[in-house]
Amino acid sequence: MSPPSSGTDRSRELGRPSDTRAAGVAERFDDASGPVDDLEYGVVTPPVLVIGAGAAGARVAIELAESGVDPLVIGKRDHGDAHTTWAAGGVNAALGSLDEADDWTIHAADTLNEGHHLNDPEAVELTAREMPARIRELDEWGMDLDRTADGKINQRYFGAQSYRRTCFVGDRTGEAMLETLIDRAQELEVPYRENVMITRLLSDGERVSGAVGFDVESGRGLVFRSNHVVLAAGGFSAVYERHSSRDDENNGDAQALALEAGASLLDLEFVQFHPTGMVGERYGEEWDGRLVTEAVRGEGGRLYNAEGERFMERYSPDQMELDARDVVARAIGREIEDGRGTEYGGVYLDISHRDGDYVRERLPRMVERFESLGVDITEEPIEVAPTAHYTMGGVDVDFRTGETGVDGLYAVGETVAGVHGANRLGGNSLAETVAIGKLVGEHVADALEAGDTDPELTDDQRAVTEREFQALESLADADGDVAPRTLLAALRELMWDHAGILRDEDELRDGLERLAALRERTADLGVAGDRTSKSFEYAVDLSFSLTVAETMLQMALERTESRGAHHRTDYPETDKEWRTNLVVSAEDGELAIRRRGVGEPSRSVQEALEEGYELDYHHLE
C-alpha cells in the first residue's frame, strides 16, 4: 500500500463535484485572455478569492455563500484532497457528553495552559465558545460522528485535556469533516478551481486585490482579480526532513505570500513535533514521518523503549502517554538519543492489550494501514518517532475578522498564529478551522462592497502580473546543474538538524549559514520541463520554503528561553520575561523582529485557570 496521492479516485471519494455540475459553476467566472509578451493568461474575477481548499477555506466559503456572496475557492490539488484529511483523531468541543462538568471556559483554560500562555486569549475564547455550535452544525450537515449508547455525540481522551471533549469519526475525523464541508459547499454551488498554484499576491503596496498563479496541469498563467483575498493554505511543517505532510503541501506558501505583501508573521519559532510519526527505516521511506494518530494513545496505547520500559513513567507519571505533545515528543527524542530506541530509530507504541474488536472499531484506518504493511496492531506494537506536524506560528491576524493589517487580505486556519501559542492541544486544529472560519466569512461578507469586481487590471496590477509571469518563465527555462528537489531535500535536512526538537545558538547560527549557502546554489538551478512539470513546482516550493525557513531560524535564535515546542538546550528554563510574542515583518528587504505583549483572558477563563482541572488517565490501564 502506498500513501494516498492526489489522484482523481480519492477526489471522487471525498465528494468531488460531477464534471457537469463543476462546469456549470465555473461558468460564473469566465476567463479572458491577455498577452504578456508571448505568454497567454486567463483573468478570473470573483469578488472573494479563497486560497486553500481544506476545512478552513471551505468553512469561509460556506459562510460567504450563505451570505449571498459568490466566492471562488482554489486548491493546489484535486478537489477534496487537502491536508485536512490527515487530521485523524478528533475535534474538540466542550459538549459534556461524557463529562458534564466540562464547559468552554475549561476548554479555553486547557488551551492557554498547553500554549504556555503565549496564545491570543481572545482567539482562544472565540474558538472554545464557538465549538459546541459548530459541532452540532456539522452533525446537522451529515458528519457521521461517533455516538454513545444513548445517542449523544461521543468524546474521547486527548492529551493534556481536563475532560473527554474530543469528538471523532473513528480515526478519520478530518476526512469526514472535509467531506461534510464539501457536501455543504456543493449544495450552495460554491465554485472551486483545482490544481492551481499561487505564486504572488496582487498588491499596490497598500491593498491586496487578487493573486497571480498558474494551472499545474496546463501550465497556463492565471490572474485572479478580487475585492478580497483569504489565505487558508496551511502551514510550513514540510520544511523539515521528517514531516507528516506530503512533500508538495505545507511548504510555507501562505506565510511567504503574506510577508511579501506587507503582512506580519508571528511566533514562527513554535513548530509542533508530533510524538508519533511512522519510522521510514521500518516501514519504507515513503511512509517516513507519516502521522500515527494521537487517538491510538487516547484509546490506551502505551509507549515502550527497546528495553521494554514504559518510559513515560519517568517523564510524566501522572499523565503518562497523554501529556502534552511537546512533553511526549521530547521524551521519545531523549530515549532515542540516549540509546534506548529501536534498531530503526524509534520507540514502540503498543495497543495490543486492548480488545481487538474495540481497536478495529475505534482505529480502523490505523488497522488498515499497518495491515497493508504486514503489521497487526491488535497483536503487536508499531515503531514511532517524532515528526514535524503542525506550525503554531503564522500570519498575524485579528481573529474576530481575519484581517492581516493589509487591506483586502485575510487569513485563517493553520496559515495564522494565535490560537495555539507555544504548543497546540490535540484536537484544536480542526476546531480552529470551523470556529474561526465562520467568523472570517461573516466579516468578509459584511466588508464586501456592493457590485461586481472590475475585470480590468490597473496599470500597477498589470505591471506586477507581467513581472511575475516573466519570472516564472525564466524559472521554467533555468538550465543549471542543480535540481530543485535536491535543494529542497537539503533545506529539509538542514532544518531537521539545526532547528528540530532541541536547539541551541550554535546550531541555529550554523543553520542560517547553511541556508545562505543554499540560496547561492539557486543561481545554478536547473528545471527539467515546463510549468507543468513537478520540477517546476518544486522550484516554486523551494522559493517559499527558503523564505519561511530563514524567518523561523531568526526567530528561534531571538527567543532565548525554552517554552512549549521551542526548546533551547542553552536556555533550558522558561523565562517569565519572555511571555511575549515575536512579530516579524519585511522592511526594505530585511527581516525586522520585534516583541509584543500578550493579552489577558476574560474573568471567567481566569477563574477556570485558577481552579485547575486534572484528569486521572490511569483508568485507561
Regions found by a protein language model. Give the residues of each.
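Glycine- and aromatic-enriched mobile tails/lids
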Residues: 10, 19, 25-46, 60-63, ...
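Core beta-strand elements of the Rossmann-like FAD/NAD(P) dinucleotide-binding domain
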Residues: 43-46, 218-228, 405-406
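Glycine-rich Rossmann-fold phosphate-binding loop(s) that bind the pyrophosphate
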Residues: 52-54
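N-terminal Rossmann-fold NAD(P) dinucleotide-binding loop
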Residues: 57
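Short beta-strand "acidic-cap" motif of Rossmann-like dinucleotide-binding folds
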Residues: 70-75, 267
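Conserved N-terminal glycine-rich FAD pyrophosphate-binding loop of Rossmann-like flavoproteins
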Residues: 77-110, 116, 276, 283-288
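Conserved redox-cofactor binding core of oxidoreductases
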Residues: 134, 140-220, 232, 274-283
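An anion/pyrophosphate-binding glycine-rich loop and adjacent beta-alpha core
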Residues: 257, 263-376, 380, 443-450
